Structure formats: structure tokens, C-alpha cells
Amino acid sequence: MTAVDTPDLLDYDEVLAKYEPVLGMEVHVELGTNTKMFCPCPTEFGAEPNTQVCPVCLGLPGSLPVVNEAAVESAIRIGLALNCSITPWGRFARKNYFYPDQPKNYQISQYDEPIATDGYLDVVLDDGTTWRVEIERAHMEEDTGKSLHVGGATGRIHGASHSLLDYNRAGVPLVEIVTKTISGAGARAPEVARAYVTALRDLLKSLNVSDVRMDQGSMRCDANASLMPIGATELGTRTETKNVNSLKSVEVAVRYEMRRQAAVLEAGGEVIQETRHFQEADGTTSPGRRKETAEDYRYFPEPDLEPVAPSAEWVEELRGTLPELPWVRRARIQADWGVSDEVMRDLVNANALDLVIATVEAGASPEAARSWWVSYLAQQANTRGVELGELPITPAQVAQVVALIDSGKLNNKVARQVVDHVLAGEGDPEQVVADHPELVVERDDTKLKAAVDEALAANPDIAEKIRGGKVAAAGKIVGDVMKATRGQADPARVKELVIEACGG
């Protein structure tokens, strides 16, 4: 008996009462090489369709592939950073299938002899605890082309009037990183999935092997999910959810799929082994095609390529190129700055850590740099619908703003106006201040005293309270002076003048 694909969902707590969530994560990473995996075609993102192709990546008769050595180096460095064993003898294999996104009707991948095996990645969960995710393998392969389905309601082939194919991406170097089964996480399974992809993205970014842009497809996550009845030993039927294009979506997709599968099982149905597509708009998954097995792909060794046999000396040479890894770097910076675990987690979760570090390196204090990036600039990024690092302002420019505040030329309120001018493309903060002298903090005590006297005269009751020793009442007068000077006064200096005027 099978059930409707989308029965009434169970609450996640109801799922956990009867089932153990089981995960497996597959992450495809496009390598940032200049040319494709097996040919000299460029890999520029966003080029006109079918302008970065040649006989090799189109699979024309007589064309022969040549391995991109830079891609192999990147794959080995990824394996080393994931604590994997690097194979002394690996081979490419043909993965045969008949989808139009690969014009050869096969994909050159690795099957039973991958470049890296048996590693792990320790990830930090929201409460600061560590979870070890074991890595089964990391293997090299070529990417597929892109299909654009025209018409229909979802942009997928169902209901489309026709499809367009762009083979620019076909042959771009990929590393696929596959975890071992992730079980025992219970209620935290979706969180573990998100934390793993987050940590992996940070690691790959630090290695400088990919730009890991999930929104552009250079890092793509597939989440395998199944449910195992409490006390059982046999794994349930798994589904593979694709089209998970953000860190938040990883957690949402896994949680939804667990709830959906439980509802199917509780309704007396069977979970179908299939690929499913994540729908960003409503956080659900929809059915795709039935999931193939390895036998369906009829793997066999690639006859046109020699085995990959990295020497121990080469592997150790590449190990020496590994940078300070993200978790080591974070621990060092946390100690240097003297901030809490919670503050560091917030910076990482906001994708602000690298920006704050660069701002500090440009001369700002850690506290000031952090405050700008996680508050006002984060608000601006959210308003514009972009990532924090995509804002048109650099860490050096933020450091300039901090320096202008420290020098007394700007206060915090006016500094935000300066930042707005920078975001509008009007130049560096110092240039903005030069072009807009009205933004500079008023330092003329004569003018400030006149504004203070006027505010006190307009508020005699408050003036009397201040004279009677109630200094806190000065806040109202300070606020009035700030309004009168359009925010250009130094609040601390204004308060001093208010107290002086009241005989304090």
C-alpha cells in the first residue's frame, strides 16, 4: 500500500517518539580552476549559453580527455583538510545515463577507487557542543550541463512546453563529498545537517578551492533522509532531496522530509526511494524521479584516462600548503579578542567573521568592527536582499568610519549617514565627509552653549531638576540640542555643557 505523497504532517516531536532520523549528506563543490576537468574550456560563471564548449566536453567522436592537474591538487587538499586518507592509486570511471544534461550520455566520475576516503569533520552545534561527522569519500568528477524548462508552474520539466540546454557547465571540475550514515542525533538531526554544511563551506572557503556560492550552484547540497523505527536495526528507505540552496534550507528540508516520511508510514504507506526537490517558497519537498542504484549506472573504468597515482611526496607537499583551518583560526582570534563562545558563534552564523577580522586588520577595534557588521550593516544587507559581504562597502572603509568616530569628527548617528553615502557609491568615508561638511560633528562650544541655553529656557522645569541635582534629567535637554544641531553635536560634550549651565 502506498500513501498520498503529502499526507497530513506529524509534529516533529511525534516523529521522534516513534522513529530515529537517519541522514547522509552529499555535497558537490565546483572547483575554482580556470579550465574544465578534462579540456581547456574556460569555467567563467554567467557566460552566454554554449560559448564555453569544445569537442571534449561535448563528447564528439575522436576527442580525448586530459586530466586537469590543478583540479587533482584541489581534490587532494580537500581530502587532507577533511582528515581523509589519500589513495596512492585511484581511477576514473564512466557513469552511464541518458539525461540530456550530459551530451556524452555518460559522466566521468570515480566509483570504487576515489581520491580520498575515511575522514571526518567536527562541527559545532548551536549550544557549543561538538558533533563528529564521518566522511566516507571525496571523489572527483565533471559537472553536468544545465537544463532550462520553459513553461509550467515550477520551472521543472513537468508541464513545460520545451527545454533549453546550456553545456557551459558540462565538464567543470567537481569534488563530491559523501558522509557516512549520520544517526543518533535525534531531535538535532536537522541542526547537525545545517552545521555540517556550514562547517564544510567555511573549510572549503579557507582552502581557496571554490567560491562555495550556494546561490550560484558552485556548492550544491543533497540531503539523504530516512526513518528507522525506535529499536530497529534495519535502515528505512531513503529519499534524496535536491535543490537545497542555502544553509537555512538544509535544516528546513531535512526536518520537513522527516515529518513527511513519518506521515506516510503512519498512514500505512511506503516511502519511495526517489529524488525530491526542495521548494524554497514554502519549505516543502516535491517528488522527482525514482532513485537509481549504482548498478543502474553500469560503472566501468574510464578507458581514455590513466589512473591517478599521487606520490606520498606530492601529498605531503600539498599538506604543507594547507592554511590555518577555520576552527583553529577562530580559537586564536577568540583568545586574542577576549570574546565569548556565543559571540563567535553569532559572527560565524551571520557570515560576518571574515569581514570583522579584515576590519580589525584595517585598524578598527574588535568591538567597533563587530558592532558595525552585525547591526547596521546587517540591517542594510537584509533590506537589499544580499549577503553581508556583497554590500558595496569594504572592511577598510568601515575601519575609516570607526577612525572618524574615534577622532571626534563623527558621532554614531551621523556615521550611519556617512555609511549610507558610501553604500550609494559616493566614495570612501573621508571623501564623503569632505563633500558633506554638514555631517561633521559641531565642536564650536559657543554654538553649542547657545543651543543649550535655548533648550533650557524652553524647559524650565527640567532645568530646575538638574539644578537640584537630578543629573539624569539632562537627557531631555541633550536630546533637544541634538535635534537642533541635526545630530551633529557630541552628546557627551552637550551633557557637560548642560550641567555647567545649571551650576553643576
From Swiss-Prot:
What role is this protein assigned?
Allows the formation of correctly charged Asn-tRNA(Asn) or Gln-tRNA(Gln) through the transamidation of misacylated Asp-tRNA(Asn) or Glu-tRNA(Gln) in organisms which lack either or both of asparaginyl-tRNA or glutaminyl-tRNA synthetases. The reaction takes place in the presence of glutamine and ATP through an activated phospho-Asp-tRNA(Asn) or phospho-Glu-tRNA(Gln).
Keywords per UniProt: ATP-binding, Ligase, Nucleotide-binding, Protein biosynthesis
GO biological process, alphabetically ordered: glutaminyl-tRNAGln biosynthesis via transamidation; translation
What is said about its interaction partners and assembly?
Heterotrimer of A, B and C subunits.
Citing just one GO molecular function, the answer is:
asparaginyl-tRNA synthase (glutamine-hydrolyzing) activity
- Name used for this protein in its record: Aspartyl/glutamyl-tRNA(Asn/Gln) amidotransferase subunit B
Point out the gene that encodes the protein. gatB
Q: Does the keyword Nucleotidyltransferase apply?
A: no
Q: What is its EC number?
A: 6.3.5.-
SUPFAM superfamilies referenced in this protein's UniProt entry, alphabetically:
GatB/YqeY motif, Glutamine synthetase/guanido kinase
**Matches recorded under Pfam families:** GatB_N, GatB_Yqey
Q: Which HAMAP family match?
A: GatB
Which reactions is this enzyme annotated as catalysing? L-glutamyl-tRNA(Gln) + L-glutamine + ATP + H2O = L-glutaminyl-tRNA(Gln) + L-glutamate + ADP + phosphate + H(+); L-aspartyl-tRNA(Asn) + L-glutamine + ATP + H2O = L-asparaginyl-tRNA(Asn) + L-glutamate + ADP + phosphate + 2 H(+)
Signal sequence coordinates: none
What family does this chain come from, according to its entry?
Belongs to the GatB/GatE family. GatB subfamily.
